[in-house]
Amino acid sequence: MERLIDVASYPVLPVLDKLLQNKSTKKNIIWATDTYASFGNGFQDTDQIDRTLLLQHADVIRPRIRKSMEDQAQRTRKKAEVFTPAWVCNEMNNVCDEDWFHRKNVFNTPQEDHSWIPTEGKIELPKRKRWQRYVDSRRLEITCGEAPYLCSRYDASTGERIEPLNSRIGIVDRKLRIVNENTKTREEWVKWAVRALDASYGYEYQGDNVLIARVNLFLTFIDYYKDRWGEIPPGKLLRKIANRIAWNIWQMDGLKDIVPTGKPYEEFHQMTFGELFSLDWEEAERKMEEAAAIPAVIYHWRSKISVLFRKVKEKTMGKKLFDFVIGNPPYNEDFGKSGNNGKYAKPIYHRFMDAAYSIAPKVELIHPARFLFNAGSTPKEWNEKMLNSSQFKVLEYEANSARVFSNTDIKGGVVISYFDRNASYKPIGTFTTFPELNSILKKVKSLSDTFVSSIVSGRGIYKLSDKALKEHPEIIDIQSKGHKKDVGPGALNKLEHIVFFDNLPNDDNKYVQFLGLKEGKRSYCWTREDYQDVPDSFYKYKIFIPKANGSGALGEVLSTPLIGEPLIGATETFLSIGMFDDFLEAANCLKYIKSKFTRVMLGILKITQDNTKTKWNYVPMQDFTPSSDIDWSQSVHDIDLQLYQKYGLDDVRGQ
């Protein structure tokens, strides 16, 4: 198999020392991953990448697609790596160029099969724009990994080489094509090829990725030089290029703007009394050195100055350094850091989005889409901010993430978004997956005052009583910390023979039934009424429906909703809908919930398996009594037809 990256061979080997430099620390970049820890000293998470040690194991530096499946899975989970296919990078880079050239498909034309046809002939420039301005446009790929947006020697998701050169789709590839087509002498070509690199930036957390990205840019420059001049560049030029790349592809924690593994930046460390009089001065100095995290430094080539990256976020610098930011940010923290026994991964992509908006006027990113439906775990206030922003819009939405990132399930899909600081777009407001849903929602809202969410229970409406805890204090040890009164999804199993019983006990206490899951199956168990704190709906008819249901596909059938009779409660596995005086009203509500109309309206916000109260915000409330404008005695199909007529809708059979 062809080696895409070989740090031990010419022409990389002579400049490897340059490509390993960290300009912020004036040392080498560090590994910042434990993937290679088994090789011993020098390969640990915080170790610098030493040239001599690296060359003893040079074959470990290879694209992620060439790593073992185990390593890929570990890095995807632990470091939130999702590598972007070339066709996605191409389409996103095309948007960036559409903004500059004021026309679509400048360098190539994407095809339905995700291939692309390169533009033949010389690239035509817009009137009153010089090609040098395009080369000098400063573009940053955040969390760049192997730098697939910047250069495209190969497809990062498949490992396949991209040839010939005019088929390549990276930012630097496009700039070097423009340089090729508009320069005549070697001196002029070198000048502008160097400037193309000067204006192309990327940062990355993990040291192996930083090195691979740098090597990819370095070899990309050589490819274009050889294609134009028929030979490899001279050694002096190669070292100049390697040095520039070491500046422009830097190692950084993108949320803290510091060199990885450092603590938050501290400009001055106040020595403690103990440190001041400690006999172990070396230890005290080591602690001081660790306490002061090193801020990332980048270089402004036109101004010929280095600057702290965090200064770029200040308004005095923000509009001067980057014209455009692009990329695929990490989606979540390491699962092990976010709680819930490693089953929950806290989202962080929204923080990278905000950071990108602070350093460039235009930003294009691909990331999870759940926030568009006010779902997921991103802060609700942040969701609202984005949905109501006049500077933010959606370019493309894909509900099935596996169509973009193979074998990757991202609940709620993924979206390519675009931010323009100077734009005035119509705010998204309510995002719908299909254009037809916008008109349906508009009609329904115009004829509706209340919605089903107003009668859907929130989580935790059933609680264990103080009496249950007093008579059985062992419950506190059995329950999760901070949830001693919860009647959670596993309550029928966890509290069996204490609170819940399969068979009705033969004693003088009053017992009621609870619906829940036992060994994965729906079950009814008996519980003492005085062991439960219950809502008013407990004494009425209601509908029970699973809190988690399906995948989020529009219009999907709900998992067997059922009527809960009076004196029947439920664990947190189920939502409770309504509080009806008689069985007929509950039966009518059940028919409504089963209707296609309801399922489509529910699907506007329910884009994952999560089926919470807020997902019902756009399902209009109905009168379920015999005096209703809907004849509930009809079949569910005929009820659908009545609902379509009521709201002036075409049959939503196609939804």
Q: What is each PLM-predicted segment?
A:
Residues R75, V82, W87, C96, ...:
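C-terminal substrate-recognition regions of SAM-dependent nucleic acid methyltransferases
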Residues E2-V394, N400-V404, G413, D420-P427:
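SAM-dependent methyltransferase catalytic region
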